[in-house]
């Protein structure tokens, strides 16, 4: 069944790489919109949780009363992609959560059966770029040019989580891209390269848009079968 309309993707727009993700999604043919209110989630086919500062985004999510609506969106099965701090927000567990002034650990939205470590590759000065083999992308034989900025890695993943890319650190393969059902997460920032012609990387966002199209088609087929 054909979709018959433009896919609508939201980018949580409280802090972080919002404009870059909007541009990447538009370049993939989706209608991309910033999301700041719970009511704006209703008409989305998919959602991006952008890179930024995970503790700041956690505080803003609570301040804007978005925690429960976002958890409900994730639980709905619609595709969600988290990059860098977005991966932290999707994780069920944080190995080293930041603490607020009262000693309470930062919270996540959850949904992805992984344990992440914040700033695992180091601080801002330790940011780096590398070429990654990334399964499940179009032209998967061509490596992804990945930008890591104060990035997390995944220390443990559940049995239903598929590891799509790893970085080898001190002899250990660290998972930096995973998928579980319609949840997708990367430690790195593909969105920052969208405007750079020599290294432009849209394939991660193309994967998200493909997931959105598949979900919408499944919903349409189920609705048709109930008639």
From Swiss-Prot:
Task: Name the SUPFAM superfamilies on file.
Answer: Class I glutamine amidotransferase-like
For this protein, the Enzyme Commission number is 4.3.3.6, 3.5.1.2
**Disulfide pairs?**
none
> What family name appears in the similarity comment?
Belongs to the glutaminase PdxT/SNO family.
Assembly description: In the presence of PdxS, forms a dodecamer of heterodimers. Only shows activity in the heterodimer.
- A single GO cellular-component term on record: glutaminase complex
What name appears for this protein in its UniProt entry? Pyridoxal 5'-phosphate synthase subunit PdxT
List ligand-binding residues for L-glutamine.
52-54, 118, 149-150
Pathway assignment: Cofactor biosynthesis; pyridoxal 5'-phosphate biosynthesis
Protein's UniProt keywords contain Cell inner membrane:
no
């Amino acid at each position: 069944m054909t979709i018959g309309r433009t896919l609508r993707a939201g980018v949580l727009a409280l802090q972080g790489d919002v404009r870059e993700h909007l541009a990447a999604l538009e370049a993939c043919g989706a209608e991309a919109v910033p999301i700041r209110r719970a009511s704006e989630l209703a008409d989305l086919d998919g959602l991006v949780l952008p890179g930024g500062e995970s503790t700041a985004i956690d505080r803003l999510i609570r301040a804007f009363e978005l925690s429960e609506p976002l958890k409900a969106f994730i639980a709905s099965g619609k595709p969600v992609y988290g990059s860098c701090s977005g991966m932290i927000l999707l994780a069920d567990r944080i190995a080293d959560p930041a603490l607020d002034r009262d000693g309470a650990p930062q919270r996540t939205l959850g949904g992805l059966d992984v344990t992440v470590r914040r700033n695992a590759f180091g601080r801002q000065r330790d940011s780096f770029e590398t070429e990654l083999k990334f399964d499940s992308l179009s032209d998967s034989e061509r490596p992804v040019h990945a930008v890591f900025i104060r990035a997390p890695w995944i220390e443990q993943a559940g049995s239903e989580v598929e590891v799509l890319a790893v970085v080898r650190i001190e002899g250990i393969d660290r998972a930096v891209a995973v998928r579980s059902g319609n949840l997708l997460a990367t430690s790195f920032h593909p969105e920052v390269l969208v405007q750079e012609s020599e290294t432009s990387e849209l394939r991660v966002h193309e994967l998200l848009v493909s997931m959105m199209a598949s979900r919408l088609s499944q919903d349409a087929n189920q609705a048709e079968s109930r008639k």
